[in-house]
């Protein structure tokens, strides 16, 4: 059989049906697409007019107009851009997925492409009009052609179209949508303005709509005011007004934007009445080019911990709004950041509603993350004397300096930020390996030296005692529980500072942070305490002798508590308390196990180690007591209570205590 090369065939009517009914998830996007096409047409004329000024004819001011006729049930989008000849209308409107804008971009030089604000690229946006219209009529005349060479194109979206020559004095294009009965909402001035404000507020061209004003109805009985009136209505005045900003604050040079304007823009995009703590506005130049304006809020939203809630910055492509929560452009642990990212390089799906993973997306994500961390490092430096921030990696994209108020105004802001978002920032230790060191420098904790969450790891390390070999910390449910934990007693005695960690995320996060600047982090509630050079030989010898002398008692305790404790041993960490619970060095703490169970997740069934203070009177009283079993269980349950836990059988605990009291 001979080999053949054949072309794919398409059922045009079915293809149009798919484009108009399956491609777009949001019906109102049709207006964004048609306004973007109109903007492209004006931009094409702007470029063509550089060499042929006569193309502007007698209307050099480029604009887009949106109007509607409730009686005729039509919605019209008109531009005075480049327009189309009859042949161009047949080629561009009669061929699905043929992008005139993409063809035009291919004819521009490199510098012209940089300056162009052309939006379209797929050649299907026009057909989104059929989402709301059962017929579309296009009237157009190409700039430079006589008025007699206008063209009218019309189609019902069923696979065929009609074309005829018309007289059209004005250059440019009018797209007339004959709306379906179900699309009556788009014959409403307020509705159209809200869509334009959402999607096309920042394109560089003015978008005009006819003004409306309220007009009272006629008197039911002429001359009789008391007889009532017919219902009033909004009526058109004949004057046109600009309904978009026609500029993008983030596209302006930073020197031309005041702090007040930055703050006001933040309130507009975030719906937050409070001013932001700080912001960064920069244009990144490199393999991927984009502009970003990122804000750090002053207050956490009520749903910050709702993992199902979408969060992220607003994404624009060439000033056209694409999506509200572009989660792919910032990691989850920075979900509190608000702002705008605008790029021409991002790969979108055909409907321009979804962002596709690519090298450019990853580059923007990495650059935006570094920018946010730089803002936080800047706040931290001004908040107090802190360790210097890491320098940008060699070859990183060039970014401008952070734009913010003067240095004096930054004092205290990092403490304010950390009180609101510190716990979220800790999630980054497990999510962002590349920036783990920078994140570690931004962490703040309370300690045995300060009840305020103001101690950084660098600060702690700078004041470690001579001979101290680890950064010590303890996790607990509350600050009070951490401060009064029995495990801290030997550290307090020796004047060793211990970090107090009370956020739910702490223990999970520290699974990913094992050392800081070469110094290991060690929980005082895990494993055996080895203070190394901080413990003198006499103390070590006394501990060894006590362990040997108490072997029979320890064996008896272990047998009695075999269902509760994995092991029983003499402690070196207690001074005043009779006992405490610890876990093996690589084990899950009882606190983390409790948190997992409270969250409805499975936690491994593990038993803690009971450590007893050989010098405590209660422990010494155990040997020979007729209430040995009851005292052993009470000792264990009290140790559990001291670290914020509850006895497995509270009633049995109370019964044992009562029995000893009488």
UniProtKB/Swiss-Prot annotation:
The main location class comes to cytoplasm
- Cleavable signal peptide: none
Q: Name the segments for region: Disordered.
A: 382-402
- A Pfam family matched in the record: HSP90
Region of interest (A), residue spans: 1-352
Cell compartments where the protein resides? Cytoplasm
Residue runs in coiled coils: none
Q: Which UniProt keywords apply?
A: ATP-binding, Chaperone, Cytoplasm, Nucleotide-binding, Stress response
Q: Which InterPro entries match?
A: HATPase_C_sf, HSP90_C, Hsp90_fam, Hsp90_N, Ribosomal_Su5_D2-typ_SF
Region B: what ranges? 353-594
Q: Where is this region: C?
A: 595-662
Which GO terms label this protein's molecular function in UniProt? ATP binding; ATP hydrolysis activity; ATP-dependent protein folding chaperone; unfolded protein binding
| Stated family | Belongs to the heat shock protein 90 family.
Q: What role does this protein play?
A: Molecular chaperone. Has ATPase activity.
The record's HAMAP family line, in alphabetical order, gives:
HSP90
Sorted alphabetically, which NCBIfam families does this protein's record hold? PRK05218.1 (NF003555)
| Subunit architecture | Homodimer.
Q: What name has this protein been given in UniProt?
A: Chaperone protein HtpG
Q: What is the lineage of its organism?
A: Bacteria, Pseudomonadati, Pseudomonadota, Betaproteobacteria, Burkholderiales
């Amino acid at each position: 059989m001979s080999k053949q090369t054949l072309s794919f065939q398409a059922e045009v009517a079915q293809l149009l049906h798919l484009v108009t009914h399956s491609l777009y998830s949001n019906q109102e996007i049709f207006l964004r697409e048609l306004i973007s096409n109109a903007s492209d047409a004006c931009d094409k004329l702007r470029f063509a007019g550089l060499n042929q000024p006569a193309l502007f004819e007698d209307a050099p001011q480029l604009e887009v107009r949106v109007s509607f006729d409730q009686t005729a049930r039509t919605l019209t989008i008109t531009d005075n851009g480049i327009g189309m000849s009859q042949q161009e209308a047949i080629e561009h409107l009669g061929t699905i997925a043929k992008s005139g804008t993409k063809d035009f971009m291919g004819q521009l030089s490199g510098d012209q492409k940089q300056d162009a604000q052309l939006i379209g690229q797929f050649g299907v946006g026009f057909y989104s009009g059929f989402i709301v219209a059962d017929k579309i009529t296009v009237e157009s005349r190409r700039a430079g052609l006589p008025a007699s060479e206008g063209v009218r194109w019309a189609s019902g979206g069923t696979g065929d179209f009609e074309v005829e020559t018309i007289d059209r004095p004005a250059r440019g294009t009018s797209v007339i949508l004959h709306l379906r009965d179900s699309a009556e909402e788009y014959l409403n001035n307020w509705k159209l303005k809200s869509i334009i404000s959402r999607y096309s507020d920042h394109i560089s061209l003015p978008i005009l709509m006819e003004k409306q004003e309220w007009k009272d109805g006629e008197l039911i009985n002429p001359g009789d005011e008391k007889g009532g009136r017919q219902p009033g209505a909004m009526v058109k005045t004949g004057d046109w007004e600009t309904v978009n900003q026609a500029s993008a604050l983030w596209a302006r040079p930073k020197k031309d934007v005041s702090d007040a304007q930055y703050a006001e823009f933040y309130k507009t995009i975030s719906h937050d009445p409070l001013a932001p703590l700080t912001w960064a506005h920069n244009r990144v130049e490199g393999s991927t080019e984009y502009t970003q304006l990122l804000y750090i809020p002053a207050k956490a939203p009520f749903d910050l911990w709702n993992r199902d809630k979408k969060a992220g910055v607003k994404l624009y492509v060439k000033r056209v709004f694409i999506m509200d929560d572009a989660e792919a452009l910032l990691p989850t642990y920075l979900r509190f950041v608000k702002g705008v990212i605008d790029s021409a390089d991002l790969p979108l799906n055909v409907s321009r509603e979804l962002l596709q993973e690519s090298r450019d997306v990853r580059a923007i994500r990495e650059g935006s993350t570094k920018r946010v961390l730089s803002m936080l490092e800047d706040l931290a430096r001004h908040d107090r004397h802190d360790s210097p921030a890491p320098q940008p990696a060699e070859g990183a994209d060039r970014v401008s300096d952070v734009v913010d108020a003067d240095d004096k105004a930054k004092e205290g802001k990092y403490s304010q930020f950390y009180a609101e978002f510190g716990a979220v920032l800790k999630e980054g230790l497990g999510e962002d390996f590349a920036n783990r060191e920078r994140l570690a420098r931004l962490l703040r904790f309370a300690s045995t030296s300060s009840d305020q969450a103001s101690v950084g790891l660098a600060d702690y390390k700078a004041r470690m005692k001579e001979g101290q070999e680890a950064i010590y910390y303890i996790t607990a449910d509350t600050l009070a529980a951490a401060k009064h934990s029995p495990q801290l007693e030997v550290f307090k005695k020796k004047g060793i500072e211990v970090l107090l960690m009370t956020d739910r995320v702490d223990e999970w996060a520290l699974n990913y942070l094992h050392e800081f600047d070469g110094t290991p982090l060690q929980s005082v509630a895990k494993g055996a305490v080895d203070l190394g050079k901080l413990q003198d030989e006499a103390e070590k010898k006394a501990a060894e002798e006590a362990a040997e002398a108490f072997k029979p008692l320890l064996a008896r305790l272990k047998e009695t508590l075999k269902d509760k404790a994995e092991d029983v041993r003499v402690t070196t960490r207690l001074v005043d308390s009779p006992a405490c619970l610890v876990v093996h060095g690589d084990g899950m703490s009882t606190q983390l196990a409790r948190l997992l169970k409270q969250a409805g997740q499975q936690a491994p069934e593990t038993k803690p180690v009971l450590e007893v203070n050989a010098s405590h009177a209660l422990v010494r009283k155990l040997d020979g007591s007729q209430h040995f079993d009851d005292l052993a269980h009470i000792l264990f349950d009290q140790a559990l209570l001291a670290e914020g836990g509850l006895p497995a059988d509270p009633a049995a605990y109370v019964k044992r205590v009562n029995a000893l009291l009488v």
